[in-house]
Amino acid sequence: MTEARSDSRRMTISDPQVMRAMAHPARIAIMEYLNSREAGGTATECAEIVGLSPSATSYHLRALAKFGLVEQAPSRGDARERLWRVPSGSVLVEAGRDAGPEARAAEQALVEAHAVRAMERTRDWLRRAGDESAEWYDTALFTDTLVLLTAEELAELNEAVLALLRPYHPRRRQGEPPPGARTVAVQYRTVPLA
């Protein structure tokens, strides 16, 4: 199972303890926020995103740092300000086919936490969709498609989709984003059916 497979700065995680540390909703949001910003962010900035106090957010940042999931970033000039960043570009979470029950349960908890976050985003969009401009309303897309593939074809499909997304990742974009650009959640999953 993956979050993203092709990235030269990919971090691979198979340790159940690390997976459990990552499975907290606030930590998922913190890592996502920091991963979208090349310069990183402060605990206060992260707190605004996750809806916690800066001190509670600092606790979560330290917990993530314990496992190397975040690290202190170079200062923006204010020595009193502590910046954090995600050291790798993407994360591969994979207990492995032969994983024991503890690793399998930790992987499942982490994937389910991400699935809950994805569903929350979808519900949020549906609640406010009528207030969006026609431009954004008309370009939002929901699709659920069953396809017939070999394992090799599925691997090729996954790589092709990830390759299409790669240039749009905030940390990979060159220069300032175009006027009117917004963060868009692209929720892509491929799961072989029984």
Give residue spans per PLM region.
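Short alpha-helical segments that sit at the start of domains
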Residues: 2-29
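Short, cationic-aromatic polyanion-contact patches
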Residues: 20-24, 42, 75-98
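Short helix-capping/hinge SLiMs at alpha-helix to coil transitions
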Residues: 24, 35-38
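A short acidic, leucine-rich amphipathic alpha-helix
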Residues: 45-49
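Glycine-centered, phosphate/nucleic-acid-interacting loop/turn motifs that mediate DNA/RNA or nucleotide
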Residues: 68
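Amphipathic alpha-helical dimerization/coiled-coil segments
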Residues: 85-147
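Charged, low-complexity intrinsically disordered regulatory/assembly segments
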Residues: 131-194
